[in-house]
UniProtKB/Swiss-Prot annotation:
Biological source species: Caenorhabditis briggsae
Keywords (A to Z) from UniProt: Glycoprotein, Glycosyltransferase, Membrane, Signal, Transferase, Transmembrane, Transmembrane helix
Pfam families: UDPGT (PF00201)
Domain of life: Eukaryota
Subcellular location: Membrane
Protein name as it appears in the record: Putative UDP-glucuronosyltransferase ugt-47
Signal peptide, first to last residue: 1-21
Length: 536
């Protein structure tokens, strides 16, 4: 009897658990390893909460098989062989110009190439009807996808998934504000142009112009994406931007403690640090041995994958190795590309440096002997460093990296160093490194950032899981969607009111002004003649 009772209890517990388990699709195109890892963490957290998760990895770059993106969820892998090379070429092109300052036209051109290549891959994926039918049969309750390209949201709508969640994988960019018709704070946040801590008039103007131009560009590219979906699913298929504007929740994969403080939305939830393992301290003996070197500690150097050390100007790494020699009391760990033979060869004669194409970054960041992290300011690395309390020297190259580096500088736990310094002015970069190693305020502020993040009333996992379950359970939360999300740019910024008022004001000012000038001119030219006639 007791056995039967125990079995019934187990069955009831199983049924109760099953009721709250949802079928969820995580849409994860392979745009880079860091994005695969970020989406893998989202999938794992949903699975850890008891949900049935399908992690759909579309291999845009041929990197899915070698990237450990998820630990708990089995990956569903889709190949896109036709458009893969075109997408690779675009990213390779970014690597080749990473040391340049592209300006507005370069920014526009780069975005057009990226979105065109992505849209072509999206179109190729849409033609895989067998995969579509297989996914449609699973009757998903929820859908997650990033903001880099909004192809996934059109796909989710076609699958009939009504609860859709937008993941902003980097700080809230101006075009994501534009999705919701939420005015972006161009005066204070450097979205698409560099701005000093106290922005000048020119910096604010450039940021506004670049942001507005990019918003218009994305609207145009999204129109083309909608055309692709209507060709596939019929002319009555809604526009993809409209689908995105009605996403239930925007999950920001960033931390508000790290980012610029800026206006937010009722359906925007920060989940920075989700899935980051703060207990990752174990490392292989070879790396443990390296961490013991250096009388005053260890310095980590990694520029990510876009600023590839095998494709950027050789002088960059040669200059850095020259700086390494001037700090003999510190041991340097350098992550260099596996094809970068030049850096590895030049490092052989330097006693205080270790070069590898892979380093256990999370474990190194949590090691007590690490003094600073020199990074390109990619967000995954920033979150890991923030949670470890490690001060940063950032060398931003492109994308969200400048925005990230300025936020770190603003909050006092890092130094922003211009990418041209290692190329043209290594002495200035050396001065930045000396400042970091001799000024304890950076470490103090990094520890404060760490403590603020870890002591927040509600952690990233609780925010993420509870919000997701709450939304699906209640059939969406339209009550949180912004009222102005369907407005045009003209209505959203009240241009239809402001412009006519300005014209009226100008008219009221200009007409009297010209009358005054005309009267003055007339009097100066003819007044003396009229006066003479009167005297006569």
């Amino acid at each position: 009897m007791m056995l039967q009772t125990s079995t019934i209890l187990q069955l009831l517990l199983f049924l109760v658990g099953s009721v709250s388990a949802y079928n969820i699709l995580v849409f994860s195109p392979a745009t880079s390893k860091s994005h695969l890892i970020s989406n893998g963490r989202i999938a794992d957290e949903l699975a850890r909460a008891g949900h049935n998760v399908t992690l759909l990895e579309i291999d845009f770059l041929g990197i899915v098989d070698t990237t450990k993106s998820a630990k708990l969820v089995k990956k569903t892998i889709v190949r896109t062989p036709k458009g893969m090379q075109g997408f690779r070429n675009v990213l390779q092109g970014f690597s080749e110009i990473v040391m340049e300052d592209p300006g507005l036209w370069g920014l526009v051109e780069g975005n057009i190439m990226y979105q065109n290549a992505y849209n072509a891959l999206c179109e190729e994926f849409l033609e895989m009807d067998d995969i579509f039918q297989e996914l449609k049969a699973q009757n998903f309750d929820g859908f997650f996808a990033e903001q880099l390209n909004i192809c996934g949201f059109g796909y989710a709508k076609a699958l009939g998934i009504e609860r859709r969640f937008l993941i902003s994988s980097c700080p809230y960019f101006s075009h994501v504000y534009d999705y919701t018709s939420h005015p972006a704070p161009y005066a204070s946040v450097p979205f698409v142009a560099d701005m000093s801590p106290e922005p000048t008039y020119f910096e604010r103007a450039q940021n506004l112009l670049n942001g507005f131009t990019c918003n218009m560009l994305f609207r145009y590219m999204h129109t083309r994406l909608s055309f692709i979906f209507r060709n596939k699913f019929g002319q009555d298929f809604p526009s993809v931007p409209e689908i995105v504007r009605n996403a239930d929740i925007i999950f920001l994969a960033t931390d508000e403690i790290i980012d610029f403080s800026a206006p937010t939305l009722p359906n925007l939830v920060n989940i920075g640090g989700l899935g980051v393992d703060d207990d990752t301290t174990e490392m292989e003996p070879v790396f443990e041995a390296e961490m013991k070197k250096g009388e005053k500690g260890v310095i980590l150097f990694s520029l990510g994958t876009i600023a590839n050390t095998s494709t950027i100007d050789k002088k960059v790494m040669e200059s850095f190795l020259g700086i390494v020699k001037k700090f003999p009391d510190y041991h340097f760990l350098i992550r260099a590309d596996k094809y970068d033979k030049n850096t590895k060869e030049r490092a052989k004669g330097i006693s205080n440096v270790f070069v590898s194409d892979w380093l256990p970054q999370p474990a190194i960041l949590h090691h007590p002997r690490l003094r600073t992290f020199i990074t390109h300011a990619g967000y995954n690395g920033l979150v890991e460093a923030a949670r470890a309390g490690v001060p940063l020297i950032t060398i931003p190259f492109m994308f969200d990296q400048n925005l990230n580096s300025r936020a770190i500088e603003k909050k006092g736990w890092g130094i922003r160093s211009d990418k041209k310094k290692l190329l043209n002015d290594p002495d200035s970069f050396e001065a930045d490194l000396k400042e970091m190693l001799t000024n304890p305020s950076y470490t103090k502020n990094a520890h404060r950032i760490r403590d603020l993040i870890k002591s927040k009333p509600l952690g990233a996992r609780d925010r993420f899981i509870k919000t997701t379950e709450w939304v699906i359970q209640n059939g969406g939360v339209r009550e949180l969607l912004t009222e102005g999300r369907d407005l045009s740019i003209i209505s959203s910024y009240n241009l239809d009111i402001i412009v006519p008022v300005l014209f009226v004001l100008l008219y009221c000012l200009i007409i009297p002004f010209f009358k005054l000038i005309g009267g003055f001119y007339y009097y100066s030219c003819f007044g003396h003649i009229e006066s003479k006639h009167k005297l006569d």
